[in-house]
UniProtKB/Swiss-Prot annotation:
Cell wall formation. Catalyzes the transfer of a GlcNAc subunit on undecaprenyl-pyrophosphoryl-MurNAc-pentapeptide (lipid intermediate I) to form undecaprenyl-pyrophosphoryl-MurNAc-(pentapeptide)GlcNAc (lipid intermediate II). Belongs to the glycosyltransferase 28 family. MurG subfamily. It is a peripheral membrane protein. GO terms for cellular component: plasma membrane. This is UDP-N-acetylglucosamine--N-acetylmuramyl-(pentapeptide) pyrophosphoryl-undecaprenol N-acetylglucosamine transferase. Its EC number is 2.4.1.227. It comes from the Bacteria. The keyword Glycosyltransferase applies. Pathway: Cell wall biogenesis; peptidoglycan biosynthesis. Keywords: Cell cycle, Cell division, Cell membrane, Cell shape, Cell wall biogenesis/degradation, Glycosyltransferase, Membrane, Peptidoglycan synthesis, Transferase. The lineage of its organism: Bacteria, Bacillati, Bacillota, Clostridia, Eubacteriales. One of its GO terms (molecular function) is UDP-N-acetyl-D-glucosamine:N-acetylmuramoyl-L-alanyl-D-glutamyl-meso-2,6-diaminopimelyl-D-alanyl-D-alanine-diphosphoundecaprenol 4-beta-N-acetylglucosaminlytransferase activity. The keyword Iron-sulfur does not apply.
Length: 354
């Protein structure tokens, strides 16, 4: 039996694409193992899938000054030795890396063990982890056509992003039932990313009366961001984080407000959900979400509101515009030729398996 080690972590966006590949890889006869961080979000998600999980030391890679920049390289080095030992013992035929700081030691360790590595970059420009890992990769899968020029060494392959099959098979009635909605108001789904967004949470709750006058709200607000005072608010259902329920909640929604991570926007495109994107600002990120959002806005798939312009008035104006023009966005998304990347990526994995 062929064996693959997968890696990726830090946020759900570095894990869920891996899950999308699992059923197809199993169908192709691969035994799957996973290397991730000790305390990252990926551990719980992967172990729940029944996949053997190997935790390693990992340091965060930062583009800014922080005292931890002096200690974290030693954590990465420790992670390389741990990953090298795991890889030597498990003897995988190939490694698949989805990005996130935990993947750098795994990719280096695979290279030292002469194991081929396929990486995947979701955003238009590569994150720091993938930039550091690229020299040790055999191929780097990319989601956007614009990304090819940003990957050095002629290693880029345009594959699209992998989307979980079950996400496309949600049940609208189950989603509505889960939220306890009793009327026929359109449903607005708000996603702040797997770690939540205090800015989005705050402005939504500040304008709750206004929004609830037109919509029922499903609010996925992130860990420790629930508001107990809103538990029994009619038309408002809040969740810290959802996994199995997400397909049903997506199916039930008519509009979506979201950050602009590549994975989630491609899921919205696949589901043809009219969406308002609020990308992370340049101040609090490397600007990848701004580029992602601009690409989708240019294609007519999304409406965009910059975080710096996020105010009560602008939020309501954009939301109303999106709802009034929802069919225009649905039609634009219906014309998209973007593929689900599962088949493209698994074909590449097959090709380079030792």
């Amino acid at each position: 039996m062929k064996k693959i080690i997968m890696t990726g972590g830090g946020t759900a966006g570095h894990v869920t694409p891996n899950l999308a590949l699992v059923p197809e890889l199993k169908k192709l006869g691969y035994e799957i193992k996973y290397i991730g961080s000790i305390e990252g979000i990926e551990r719980k998600i992967i172990e729940k899938e029944g996949i053997e999980y190997f935790p390693i030391s990992s340091g965060k890679l930062r583009r800014y000054f922080d005292l931890k920049n002096f200690s974290d390289p030693f954590k990465v080095l420790k992670g390389v030795f741990q990953a090298k030992k795991i890889i030597k013992k498990e003897k995988p035929d190939i490694v698949f890396s989805k990005g996130g700081f935990v993947t750098v030691p795994v990719v280096i360790a695979a290279h030292l063990n002469k194991i081929p590595v396929i990486a995947h970059e979701s955003d238009i420009t590569p994150g720091l982890a993938n930039k550091l890992a690229t020299p040790y990769c055999t191929r780097v899968c990319v989601t956007f056509p614009e990304s090819v020029k940003h990957i050095k060494g002629d290693k880029a392959v345009l594959t699209g992003t992998p989307i979980r099959r079950e996400l496309l098979e949600g049940n609208k009635l189950e989603g509505i039932k889960l939220c306890g909605f009793k009327d026929n108001k359109p449903i607005l789904l708000i996603i702040g990313g797997s770690l939540g967004s205090k800015i989005i949470n705050g402005i939504v709750r500040k304008n709750l009366d206004n929004i609830l006058s037109k919509f029922n709200i499903i609010h996925i607000c992130g860990k420790s961001n629930l508001d107990e005072n809103l538990e029994n608010r009619k038309g408002y259902a809040q969740f810290e984080y959802v996994n199995e329920e997400l397909p049903d909640l997506m199916k039930a929604s008519d509009l979506v407000i979201s950050r602009a991570g590549a994975n989630v926007i491609y899921e919205l495109l696949a589901l043809k959900k009219p969406n308002l994107l609020i990308p992370l600002s340049k101040k609090s990120s490397r600007g990848d979400q701004i580029l992602n959002a601009a690409s989708f806005e240019k294609s007519g798939y999304s409406l965009v509101l910059k975080e710096e312009e996020l105010e009560d008035k602008t939020l309501m104006k954009k939301l109303n515009h999106l709802y009034e023009n929802r069919n225009v966005y649905i039609n634009n998304m219906s014309k998209s030729k973007m593929d689900n990347g599962v088949k493209n990526i698994t074909e590449l994995i097959k090709k380079y398996t030792k």
